[in-house]
Amino acid sequence: MADTFFFTPSRRLTVANVAELTGAKLLNPEFSNIVISTLSSLEGAGEGSLVFVEHRKFSDALLGSSAVAVFCTNEIVFKVPESMAILVTSTPQRDFAQIGRILFPDSVKPMPWFGQREISPYAHIHPSAKFGHDVCIEAGAVIGKNVEIGSGSLISSTAVIGENCRIGRDCYIAPKVTVQYSLIGDRVYLYPGTCIGQDGFGYVGGASGIEKVPQLGRVIIKDGVEIGANTTIDRGTFEDTIIGEGSKIDNLVQIAHNVKIGRYCLIAAQCGIAGSTSIGDMSQLGGSVGVADHIVIGKCVQIAAGSGVMNDIPDGEKWGGSPARPFKQWFREVAALRNIGKVKKEKR
């Protein structure tokens, strides 16, 4: 269950409220007045717990669960115990998350580390900086010359915002974040240790050694983007590095200079995207994917974890392996290798 020491529910909902808010169909109306007070996993459920089951392979766990209500699809209904309210929906996890945001709004809205929304007298702020209303800047933050920060944004202790940067409305800049040479939209969350706008890895070799190439572009992060802890995004060499609207980037990701990431992309931890690569809207990269430079990845592409992308990928395709290739080809090759191993073992 949710830890009530850190996360206190803001309200209580009945099962009928939950059905109305999400549009789910309540199959057993006699449970309408049951109170939902928390979210849980199937195994950790207790009094007042709401759970979800999206895939049939997890449905057996319902039998031993103490949850009072479950979001599930039509195909799982017959597995649900009679003691649970059944909320049928085609998107159980999405509806579960929606109710979570209603019950625990503080869990998705970053709060000031010191509990007060104010501009601290112990922040280091250049006199030319401009702020919208209800901006919070905590002690130890550094705000450079000509910086502009939109209404409702929170700049945490030890964050550094470099000269001329723009931060939009309702943004969250966590501790130890550095932002330079960047324009950041509204509702952008940068989690601890993120570095935005530093030099790209631009060097050229010659007889006299390695020379640095000036990095003269920017980073542009559009509305609704979230960037995980200790991720780094380099500014462009001449063109901008761009992160598209609504994209979510996990912890420990490296995005090199001139990269263009489209709208609503998902990039999991430890990915590395080399310079001047572009990724189309709604594409997804699993953990530890490496992408070579100047690659074009289309829209709605899925790339399996641990893959190494060395070639362009058309729209809508699923690739995996290293070097990455279409799923069907990759699976055939893996199966062939497995069979070779079996033959050798039999000969022994």
Swiss-Prot record:
Domain of life per record: Bacteria
EC number(s) given by UniProt: 2.3.1.191
InterPro entries: Hexapep, Hexapep_transf_CS, LpxD, Trimer_LpxA-like_sf, UDP_GlcNAc_AcTrfase_non-rep
Reactions accelerated catalytically: a UDP-3-O-[(3R)-3-hydroxyacyl]-alpha-D-glucosamine + a (3R)-hydroxyacyl-[ACP] = a UDP-2-N,3-O-bis[(3R)-3-hydroxyacyl]-alpha-D-glucosamine + holo-[ACP] + H(+)
EC top class named in words: transferase
UniProt similarity note: Belongs to the transferase hexapeptide repeat family. LpxD subfamily.
Function: Catalyzes the N-acylation of UDP-3-O-acylglucosamine using 3-hydroxyacyl-ACP as the acyl donor. Is involved in the biosynthesis of lipid A, a phosphorylated glycolipid that anchors the lipopolysaccharide to the outer membrane of the cell.
Oligomeric form and interacting partners: Homotrimer.
PANTHER family in alphabetical order: UDP-3-O-ACYLGLUCOSAMINE N-ACYLTRANSFERASE, UDP-3-O-ACYLGLUCOSAMINE N-ACYLTRANSFERASE 1, MITOCHONDRIAL-RELATED
Protein name: UDP-3-O-acylglucosamine N-acyltransferase
